[in-house]
Amino acid sequence: ANLLEDLKRRDFTINAMAYNEVTGLVDAFDGIGDLERGVIRCVGNAMERFSEDALRMLRAVRFAAQLGFSIEQETQEAIAGLAGNIKKVSAERIQVELVKLLTSPNPGELKVAYRTGLTAVFLPEFDVMMETPQNNPHHCCSVGEHTLKAIEAVPADKVLRLTMLLHDIAKPACRTADKKGVDHFYGHPVRGSEMARGILRRLKFDNDTIDRVCRLVHWHDDNPELSGKAVRRAVHRIGVEQYPALFAVKRADILAQSGYRRAEKLAYVDAYEQMYRE
């Protein structure tokens, strides 16, 4: 009876199983079934579970991303209904879940946190990116959709994934349109580096992570001329410790853009890296 009471208070059915020598597997909430179906479902009443600890809403998205599962309808509706409560959760706890989500095999699941209203509370700048179009031949979708693709295109490293999350964070603020109606985002890397610093501080990241991410955001669009002298100057200006991470950032950014001149852009990064390594 005590075990059942304990399991009832767990967050999701897949986490509400126990095993002992006498009875074997105790699975009162069909956790095995949900594992087989690939479903994240709350134990009992979802509104109650999320009211007990609002961080569980972000944990649901994180588990879905890590396991490649979907979030069951009632559980997802409860998140949408209670999303505002995540503001009661400490920044440190949100940071831990966000990093696990971003470094998972399916970081694009961040879109579920957007759709359910979670990012509106702890990362409102992301919502603005999702709602900012890019009328430009280099792009085929909103700043936010491009960002999600870029996160997925970079290796699952904390600094790299945070950099891709924030690399275009200032595009909405820097957006201008020329006479032909083409959008431009002049100065967005430098402004973005400042915005990224504010966001990462707000989420209580350590100074080393903040510095590394902000430098990569600051220089992600810097394209030196392909001569030995110019590349050496760039490495000196940007800082040798930003390499070779900067090349991973550049490639992910290109792969998340439209196909316009993609081969040419990738060839440039290859040549830049070759010169850096020489």
Predicted feature locations:
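Catalytic cores of the polymerase beta-like nucleotidyltransferase superfamily
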Residues: 1-278
